[in-house]
């Protein structure tokens, strides 16, 4: 392509560079790019450190060899053996029962407390809200010891009732915080509008408030179930011999000798827990879109 090198009446003698091949600049590594690569590698290593043991455990739960030998041969024998293990089955059903009762009680109490914090101003409100966080930060070893001493002091002692009360105490702050976070996105004008149309307080709660915060309530309930079902330390302190939960029974079985059935039940627990967290995440996203 011919270039026009004329400016007015002056003709410039410029080289034709239209067909000159482009020479790419040599790529150099900057400090920012190097730090980004290091950070990316660190994230990959940490994800592998967290999830590789879980992956190995899941694979070994379906390996035919009871001694964790390779090569890998797929089998469902250990899951079938798990279904025939009366002790683990009883502990699993006991954990599910306690988790369901914990979910019901902590959700009802948590929603009531969240609505009270949302609707009313009273003396000590800020203090009570601040006291929701220490139970989640205090080591469960300390919490379990304190609960054991307290329940013996008031005559409850150990057993399923003590485990249930302990789990409700642990799960309740999660429900209040999750439901409270959802209530902060709720418009109080909706309740005022319903009241101006003649709705009673009960009708406002059931027909206006609860449907609007339903994703937060379900998310809090799932959190409560996960906290109860996976809880080991408090259950270990408060359980009676013969009436243990599944995490405690798994710990006892490992002390006697590690078997592939433990891999199988642990894999099931991890799948249930991860599924619960995915549902909670989806509910939060759905609530935000609404």
Over which residues does each language-model region extend?
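Short membrane-interfacial helix/loop motifs at transmembrane-helix boundaries
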Residues: 7, 52-86, 236-241
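Membrane-interfacial helix termini and adjacent extracytoplasmic/periplasmic loops
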Residues: 22-29, 67-69, 76, 124-125, ...
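Non-cytoplasmic
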Residues: 57-65, 175, 217-251
């Amino acid at each position: 392509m011919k270039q026009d090198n004329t400016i007015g009446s002056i003709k410039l003698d410029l080289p034709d560079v239209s067909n000159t091949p482009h020479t790419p600049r040599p790529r150099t590594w900057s400090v920012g790019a190097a730090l980004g690569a290091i950070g990316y590698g660190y994230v990959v290593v940490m994800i592998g450190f967290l999830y590789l043991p879980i992956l190995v455990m899941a694979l070994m739960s379906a390996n035919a060899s009871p001694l964790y030998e390779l090569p890998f041969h797929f089998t469902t024998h250990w899951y079938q053996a798990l279904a025939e293990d009366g002790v683990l089955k009883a502990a699993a059903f006991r954990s599910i029962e306690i988790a369901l009762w914990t979910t019901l009680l902590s959700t009802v109490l948590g929603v009531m407390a969240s609505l009270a914090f949302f609707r009313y101003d009273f003396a000590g409100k800020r203090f009570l809200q601040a006291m929701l966080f220490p139970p989640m930060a205090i080591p469960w070893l300390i919490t379990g010891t304190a609960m054991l001493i307290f329940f013996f002091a008031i005559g409850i002692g150990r057993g399923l009732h003590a485990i249930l009360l302990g789990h409700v105490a642990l799960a309740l702050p999660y429900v209040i915080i999750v439901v409270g976070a959802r209530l902060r996105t709720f418009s109080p004008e909706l309740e005022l509008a319903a009241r101006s149309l003649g709705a009673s307080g009960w009708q406002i709660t059931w027909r206006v408030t609860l449907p609007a915060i339903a994703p937060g309530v379900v998310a809090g309930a799932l959190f409560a179930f996960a906290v109860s079902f996976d809880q080991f330390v408090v259950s270990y302190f408060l359980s009676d011999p013969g009436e243990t939960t599944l995490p405690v029974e798994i710990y006892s079985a490992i002390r006697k000798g590690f078997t592939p059935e433990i891999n199988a039940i642990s894999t099931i627990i991890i799948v249930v827990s991860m599924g619960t967290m995915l549902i909670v995440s989806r509910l939060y996203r759905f609530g935000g879109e609404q």
